[in-house]
Amino acid sequence: MKFTLISSCIAIAALAVAVDAAPGEKKISIPLAKNPNYKPSAKNAIQKAIAKYNKHKINTSTGGIVPDAGVGTVPMTDYGNDVEYYGQVTIGTPGKKFNLDFDTGSSDLWIASTLCTNCGSRQTKYDPKQSSTYQADGRTWSISYGDGSSASGILAKDNVNLGGLLIKGQTIELAKREAASFANGPNDGLLGLGFDTITTVRGVKTPMDNLISQGLISRPIFGVYLGKASNGGGGEYIFGGYDSTKFKGSLTTVPIDNSRGWWGITVDRATVGTSTVASSFDGILDTGTTLLILPNNVAASVARAYGASDNGDGTYTISCDTSRFKPLVFSINGASFQVSPDSLVFEEYQGQCIAGFGYGNFDFAIIGDTFLKNNYVVFNQGVPEVQIAPVAQ
């Protein structure tokens, strides 16, 4: 779900891609571009993550371009120096382009619409009267968060073009009202990549479900690479395949617990240098969360290892000098994956720095972009499982 409150947009630029897939397989590649503007807020990111997961009341104890038909590229934006990643999706006939936040931590596709009484003036709005493939549904939807942000409206169906592959009759949620945090944000809605058991309206199929059932991709997978602003930004989503040029070494297969509708994994151990700072804990891979949000005890141990001080709001103040930091390393299913020292600092303000990790009073971790921009992930909805490898720098 959307956790970043941002208020300006930039132009979207196309990037070249390289995709791995078996011959004849269908896939979509969605690269990402960078926006250098916007001042991030770690506190906002923490609060929005808390709101997102509280509403579900969780209780836990060698590549190259493959010349296939069906390959499509949609530019995306790394907004606010790794605060949020969103991409352009075309909806309706004739098609209208919408900037959507791609989010593995939720499962709804919702957009601003002309039915909306308070949507942002700069948001692109879907108009049912202007699409010949619009189908009325009539059911209502509503999403509310613990921080007071919300969106609500009605369901409809229309064609959705995702990177050049046309999903027919995709259920979309048309916003009739939305909170200011959405209205003033950089995007026009959200595209959820979680499992369909957590759609706001039960029984609705996700875009990934329909890509599979309509035969638009040959494998039920998507690869995610999120670029770092410090390295020029960029990144890509690839549906039906993955890009082996974006990671180094081999992919490690990790089982997924999707019983709650999320991409749940187990982290076996966390270390800093030679010191183990945490033993086994559960986590959710969530591209829609900016930071690495840890269980309170794990966050406290990590903070001690880096000499960070608790700000009392889920964030930590940390040294701005990352040259003396060692990476934070997660051991997952027998392999090691790093959060690099530069990712341990999220924002700097008046000579003080806020850490790229925090806590939210959960007994599980929300493994957001702080981790994911350091590691390539292939999400496999069919098994389910993920495959992870360190990004190629």
Swiss-Prot record:
It comes from the Eukaryota. Its EC number is 3.4.23.21. Keywords: Aspartyl protease, Disulfide bond, Hydrolase, Protease, Signal, Zymogen. Transmembrane segments: none annotated. GO terms for molecular function: aspartic-type endopeptidase activity. Residues 22-68 form a propeptide. Disulfide bonds join 116-119, 320-353. The active site is at 103, 286. InterPro entries: Aspartic_peptidase_A1, Aspartic_peptidase_AS, Aspergillopepsin-like_cat_dom, PEPTIDASE_A1, Peptidase_aspartic_dom_sf. One of its GO terms (biological process) is proteolysis. Pfam families: Asp. Residues 85-389 form the Peptidase A1 domain. The keyword Transport does not apply. It catalyses: Hydrolysis of proteins with broad specificity similar to that of pepsin A, preferring hydrophobic residues at P1 and P1'. Clots milk and activates trypsinogen. Does not cleave 4-Gln-|-His-5, but does cleave 10-His-|-Leu-11 and 12-Val-|-Glu-13 in B chain of insulin. Residues 1-21 form the signal peptide. Belongs to the peptidase A1 family. This is Rhizopuspepsin. It comes from Rhizopus chinensis (Bread mold). The lineage of its organism: Eukaryota, Fungi, Fungi incertae sedis, Mucoromycota, Mucoromycotina.
